[in-house]
Regions:
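C-terminal regulatory domains involved in ligand/effector binding and gene-expression control
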Residues: 63, 69-201
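Alpha-helical support elements that line or immediately flank enzyme active sites
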Residues: 19-32, 241-252, 297-305
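Short beta-alpha connecting loops at secondary-structure transitions
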Residues: 9-11, 279-284, 329-338
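Functionally critical mobile loop/hinge segments
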Residues: 300-400
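Accessory "access/gating" subregions that flank catalytic or transport cores
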Residues: 167-252, 256-271, 277-284, 392-400
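Contiguous, well-ordered alpha-helical segments that form the cores/surfaces of helical PPI scaffolds
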Residues: 213, 217, 238-248, 263-271, ...
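Non-transmembrane, aqueous-exposed alpha-helical and coiled segments at domain scale
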Residues: 4-9, 23-47, 53-54, 82-84, ...
């Protein structure tokens, strides 16, 4: 598995696979072919069908600014290897000089055709939760300590930057009003949720309202193209920070404890990314929001100092009860149902932790098993339910 630096990516929304990934591919291509007088980018599959809503073309235009570049949306050519496929071509005096096919595999990660893995080195020797948990038990260490062992002590400075970026997104989100870009005329709601408490509000209502306000804040910032952290993707970036932000003052958790929780969450996200997928275009929203919920649950369980079995159960439950969740964004925008879904998943994460605290000893489903199940389920989903905006709510909304 790769470093958590490639899971927690600091960047701008609205989509890790449809903006951050293509931008990374374009920058890489330009480094390899800087002297062409004409470029062409051809988007296929989900990149073509929802690229306009995700502002893929706008993001690419920024990379190729000052150069002659044509962007083509090819919605007909099938994409067998990965639904997020793109070709970039370089021409000189009308002749093709270089052509590379890239796949945006989720979370801002891209690989070129023929590459078995990304260019990033694998630093984790173990690839399953079962192996990692056995290792940690033998050494009598917690999951975050295994992360530190593999990543080195310098990873804490990066995680500090991750946490600061998450908090900044929350702060901007709960202070900003207005309509989100894209044509849906969707009103920002985070500020309202944060400020509009009920008279004689119960503790339970306050808990849910604040968690949702924080999740909305980050997700709305993402939809507006603001700076966020993929956790594990842009579309699911609100869940982990919402849970951490809510819990920190509840028990006066220190920054060090929050960073350890984020390290624990990264292990969950990395295992899913390595053994399955975090891409909505590949496996539906279960791969994005399900993973985010599992990461948040694991992080919260670490804050509460639950044992490894309880952490595993909280993460497993979070995926299990998102199985089959479709990715059908209306008009290809990371707005409906994405923003609201982040809030629901944040609340679910805490529910999973509470249940795991009591029932971990009697569980029957393991984390590795549910990850495999999620991947199989995602592959079985019809393509119209995998970030193409051709089915589900996206279709019904268009027909209405």
């Amino acid at each position: 598995m790769q470093s958590l630096r490639y899971l927690y990516r600091i960047g701008n929304g609205p989509s890790s696979s449809h903006t951050m990934g293509p931008v990374a591919a374009a920058k890489r291509f330009l480094r390899e072919a800087p002297n062409a007088d004409e470029y062409q980018v051809i988007l296929y599959g989900s990149l073509a069908k929802t690229g306009s809503g995700h502002r893929t073309d706008y993001a690419l235009e920024q990379v190729f600014a000052g150069k002659n570049c044509k962007i083509v949306f090819d919605m007909e050519t099938p994409t067998d290897f990965h639904p997020n496929t793109m070709d970039i071509c370089a021409f000189l005096s009308g002749k093709l000089q270089k052509k590379t096919r890239y796949y945006s595999i989720g979370g801002g990660e891209v690989i070129a055709e023929g590459e078995k893995q990304t260019e990033h080195e694998s630093i984790y020797p173990l690839r399953s939760f079962t192996e990692i948990s056995e290792y940690c038990r033998k050494k009598e260490i917690r999951l975050w300590q295994y992360v530190e062992e593999c990543e080195g002590e310098e990873i804490w400075e990066y995680l500090r930057e991750v946490w600061q970026t998450m908090q900044a997104a929350i702060k901007r989100g709960i202070e900003t009003q207005g309509i989100l870009h894209g044509g849906l005329n969707l009103q920002r709601k985070a500020r309202y949720l944060y400020r509009q408490k009920h008279i004689d509000e119960s503790e339970e209502t306050k808990t849910n309202r604040l968690i949702c306000a924080y999740a909305y804040a980050v997700s709305e910032e993402n939809a507006a193209g603001g700076e966020i952290v993929t956790a594990p993707t842009c579309g699911s970036c609100g869940v982990v920070p919402a849970v951490m932000k809510f819990l920190q003052p509840k028990r006066n958790f220190t920054e060090e404890q929050i960073l350890r929780a984020l390290a624990t969450a990264s292990l969950i996200g990395n295992l899913i990314k390595t053994n399955a997928s975090i891409s909505g275009a590949e496996c539906g929203c279960q791969a994005e929001i399900g993973t985010a919920c599992a990461m948040a649950a694991a992080a919260a369980a670490e804050l509460y100092e639950l044992d490894i079995d309880q952490i595993e159960y909280a993460a497993e439950m979070s995926i299990e009860h998102h199985l089959g969740l479709t990715c059908d964004p209306i008009r290809g925008l990371v707005q409906i149902p994405c923003i609201e879904r982040n809030a629901i998943a944040a609340m679910r994460a805490l529910n999973a932790v509470n249940l795991a605290d009591f029932l971990a000893d009697s569980r029957m489903i393991r984390f590795d098993m549910i990850v495999d199940t999620m991947y199989e389920t995602g592959k079985d989903l019809k393509v119209i339910y995998r970030e193409t905006s051709e089915g589900g709510m996206a279709k019904r909304f268009q027909e209405a």
